[in-house]
Amino acid sequence: MLTPKRVKWRRQHRPDRAGKAKGGTKIQFGDLALQSLDVAWISSRQIEAARIAMTRHVKRGGKVWIRIFPDRPITAKPAETRMGSGKGSPEYWVAVVKPGRIMFEIAGVPEETAREALRLASHKLPCRTKIVKRQEVGEAGEG
């Protein structure tokens, strides 16, 4: 599972949930990609589950790129603990995903196979998604 190697601070404030993605909204590596339509916290376990679903479907062919990284710690206090006594300890890591963010890319397999792999991955994620295709230079919508 994905976690940062080292962090400056063990505990962070809760991430902001408003607005659209500032960067990471264009396909950089693959031919097809999975794009977020909602704001969501995606845990390292969910990212790993989606990756496994994709790689199992494409078998040995193709390449998958993960474009998000869980760099925010989410803390929790133990059950039945009274309020106070400081902030809880980090439980898991999340990637803050906003609308428009490209989360996964895939290449090297037929389009139908890639679409199905991305569809399977989308079922493992807590947000609505859409599958987008790389626009070739000179196609509509560019320029």
Swiss-Prot record:
The entry's keywords: Ribonucleoprotein, Ribosomal protein, RNA-binding, rRNA-binding, tRNA-binding
GO BP: translation
Segments for region (Disordered): 1-23
Ranges of compositional bias, category Basic residues: 1-14
SUPFAM superfamilies in UniProt: Ribosomal protein L16p/L10e
Pfam families, A to Z: Ribosomal_L16
Cellular component terms per the entry's GO annotation: cytosolic large ribosomal subunit
One MF annotation (Gene Ontology) recorded for this entry: tRNA binding
Matching InterPro entries: Ribosomal_uL16 (IPR047873), Ribosomal_uL16_bact-type (IPR000114), Ribosomal_uL16_CS (IPR020798), Ribosomal_uL16_dom (IPR016180), Ribosomal_uL16_sf (IPR036920)
Source superkingdom: Bacteria
Function: Binds 23S rRNA and is also seen to make contacts with the A and possibly P site tRNAs.
Subunit structure, interactors included: Part of the 50S ribosomal subunit.
Sequence similarity: Belongs to the universal ribosomal protein uL16 family.
NCBIfam families: rplP_bact
Name the record gives this protein: Large ribosomal subunit protein uL16
Lineage, highest ranks first: Bacteria, Bacillati, Bacillota, Clostridia, Thermoanaerobacterales
